[in-house]
Amino acid sequence: MQYYQIWCNLRDSHRDLEFCENVRAYLGHLKDAGKIEGFTITRRKFGFGPSELGEFNITISTRDMEQLDAAFSMVAPREGRLEELHRAVYSMVTDFRSGLYRDFPDPERVGASKP
């Protein structure tokens, strides 16, 4: 599995529930289209964690890089309903950070045992 990690803060923290609804609508659309396997939304608790990573963490799961690339290709035109859903999320965000992680050891690693 590949995990696209997003950390962010909200421009207006009073709109936290609206933000989560918007993320669910946007990423749910990608999941329904088979472009991602799933996602989670988590929020820092009691302020614990590095401030540079932001209060919210969104983890987007894909089978492999091919599926992740297909998701990015679907979003890239930035038009239509998908862009409306995307805009509803990114317009609420500040301090965006992202990273790409994988299960490890992964199947491509020589000498890795299978689970």
Question: Model-found features: residue ranges?
Answer:
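Acidic/histidine-enriched, glycine/proline-rich intrinsically disordered or flexible terminal extensions
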Residues: 95-115
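Short intrinsically disordered coil segments
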Residues: 21, 73-77, 113-115
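Active-site-flanking beta-strand signature of metal-NTP-handling nucleotidyl enzymes
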Residues: 2-9
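Short amphipathic alpha-helical segments
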Residues: 14-41
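Structural beta->alpha junctions
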Residues: 10-13, 64
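Short, flexible turn/loop "capping" segments at secondary-structure junctions
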Residues: 1-2, 49-52
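Short, solvent-exposed loop/turn elements at beta->coil junctions and helix N-caps
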Residues: 42-48
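An amphipathic, aromatic/His-enriched active-site/gating alpha helix that lines ligand/cofactor pockets
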Residues: 29-37, 51-55, 59-100
